[in-house]
C-alpha cells in the first residue's frame, strides 16, 4: 500500500512529508528532489516569500546510502522565514500578537474558524496556505523517481493565464518536453502576453489564475480498474489534482468539450499496425478508458482560480468586532499558475505511483520491475 501525509504550517519551523510504500532498492537522487523544489519556487508573478526561502529537502528516514529500504521515508523542508515568526508561531507560551480577524473571501479563513472553533484566523491560514505544497512536491519528487525507474515520465505546461491562451494545436503529447521558462508555457508569444497581464494585475493590486496540463508519458495499459469506483484511475487523478489549493476544475482528455460533439467525432478509433500492435490516430479520452490507462499519454487539465489574497482587499467582515471591513492582507503572489503546474506534476506522480504499486507490488524494485516486464510481455498486441 502506498500513501503519504504532510505536516507543518506556512510560518512554522518546517514542513514534513511522510511517504510510505516505496519499494526497497529504489535509488534516490537528492539533487533531483531539490531541483523539483526549485521549480516550484520560480515563476513570474511570485511574491516576496520566494526571495526568503530556498527550499532544500532533508531526508530523515527510509533511505540509506542512496537507496530506499522499504520503510517510511521522512522528508523535511525547513522554513527560513521561521526566525521572523518565532513569537507569533510559538509552540508554547501566551499569544502577544494581534489576532487576525478580517476574513479573506475565497480563502479557508471564515469557514475554518467556524468549523474548528478558533478566534484567530492565523490558526487556519497557516495550514491552508499553499506553502504546504512544498512538502507535496518533495513527496512527489520521490514518487517521480519510482515512476522513472518504471519508464514513466511526467511533464506539464501552462496553457492559459488570465484569459491569455497559448496555441495548443498539434501538440505531440507523447514527446512533450519539460519547459524551464518562468511561466512554463511552450508558446513564446502567448507567454509574453501572459507576463504583461500579470504585471498589470500586480500594479492594480489584483491576482490572476489560469490553466495547465499535466501529461503522463509511456504509461502501461491497464493500470486502474473498472470494477470499483475507488479503483478507477481517472477518479484518483482528478481527486489528486482537486486537492491542490486554489484548483477549481479538472478535465481528463477533451473533458467538458465532450458535451459539444457527437460520439462519432470523439471516441478514439483503434487500428492495427503491420505487426498487429494497436494504435490510435486520436487521444480525445486523454489516455484513460473505463477507469484504466489505455497506453496513450494521460492528459490531465486543471484550472487554478486567482489567489484570494489581494493587495487591494475585497469587502469582508471582522469575526471579532462583527463589523464590515476590508479583508486582511498577507504577503502573497500575483500569479502562481506556473508553480501550480509543478505541484500538479507532483500530485499526479503520487497518484500514478499508488496505482502502479497496487498493480505491480511494493516490496522491492527487483520484483516490481520483473512484474511490470512480465505483464507488458503478456499484453503485447
Q: What kind of feature is each model-predicted range?
A:
Residues 1-381:
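Generic N-terminal targeting/processing segments that precede catalytic cores or assembly contacts
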Amino acid at each position: 500500500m502506498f500513501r503519504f501525509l504532510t505536516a507543518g504550517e506556512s510560518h512554522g519551523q518546517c514542513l514534513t512529508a511522510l511517504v510510505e510504500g516505496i519499494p526497497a532498492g529504489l535509488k534516490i537522487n537528492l539533487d533531483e528532489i531539490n531541483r523539483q523544489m526549485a521549480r516550484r519556487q520560480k515563476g513570474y508573478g511570485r511574491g516576496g516569500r520566494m526571495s526568503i526561502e530556498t527550499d532544500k529537502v532533508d531526508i530523515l528516514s527510509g533511505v540509506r546510502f542512496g537507496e530506499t529500504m522499504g520503510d517510511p521515508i521522512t522528508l523535511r523542508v525547513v522554513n527560513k522565514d521561521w526566525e521572523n515568526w518565532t513569537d507569533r508561531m510559538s509552540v508554547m507560551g501566551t499569544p502577544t500578537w494581534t489576532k487576525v480577524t478580517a476574513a479573506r473571501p475565497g480563502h479557508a479563513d471564515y469557514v475554518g474558524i467556524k468549523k474548528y472553533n478558533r478566534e484567530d484566523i492565523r490558526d487556519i491560514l497557516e495550514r491552508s496556505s499553499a506553502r504546504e505544497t512544498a512538502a507535496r512536491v518533495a513527496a512527489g519528487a520521490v514518487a517521480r523517481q519510482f515512476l522513472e525507474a518504471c519508464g514513466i515520465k511526467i511533464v506539464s505546461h501552462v496553457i492559459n493565464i488570465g484569459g491569455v491562451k497559448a496555441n495548443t494545436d498539434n501538440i505531440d503529447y507523447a514527446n512533450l518536453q519539460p519547459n524551464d521558462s518562468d511561466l512554463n508555457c511552450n508558446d513564446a508569444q502567448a507567454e509574453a502576453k501572459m507576463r504583461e497581464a500579470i504585471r498589470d494585475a500586480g500594479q492594480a493590486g489584483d491576482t490572476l489564475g489560469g490553466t495547465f496540463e499535466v501529461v503522463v508519458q509511456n504509461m502501461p495499459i491497464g493500470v486502474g480498474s473498472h470494477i470499483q469506483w475507488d479503483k478507477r484511475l481517472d477518479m484518483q487523478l482528478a481527486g489528486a489534482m482537486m486537492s491542490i489549493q486554489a484548483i477549481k476544475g479538472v478535465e481528463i482528455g477533451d473533458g467538458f468539450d465532450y458535451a459539444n460533439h457527437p460520439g462519432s467525432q470523439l471516441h478514439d478509433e483503434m487500428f492495427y499496425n503491420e505487426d498487429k500492435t494497436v494504435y490510435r490516430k486520436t487521444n480525445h479520452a486523454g489516455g484513460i478508458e473505463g477507469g484504466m490507462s489505455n497506453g496513450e499519454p494521460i492528459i490531465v487539465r486543471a484550472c487554478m482560480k486567482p489567489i484570494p489574497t489581494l493587495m487591494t482587499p475585497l469587502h469582508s467582515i471582522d469575526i471579532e468586532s462583527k463589523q464590515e471591513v476590508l479583508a486582511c492582507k498577507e504577503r502573497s503572489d500575483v500569479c502562481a499558475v506556473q508553480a501550480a503546474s509543478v505541484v500538479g506534476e507532483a500530485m499526479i506522480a503520487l497518484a500514478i505511483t499508488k496505482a502502479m504499486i497496487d498493480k505491480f507490488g511494493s516490496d522491492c524494485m527487483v520484483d516490481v520491475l520483473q512484474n511490470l516486464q512480465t505483464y507488458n510481455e503478456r499484453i503485447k498486441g
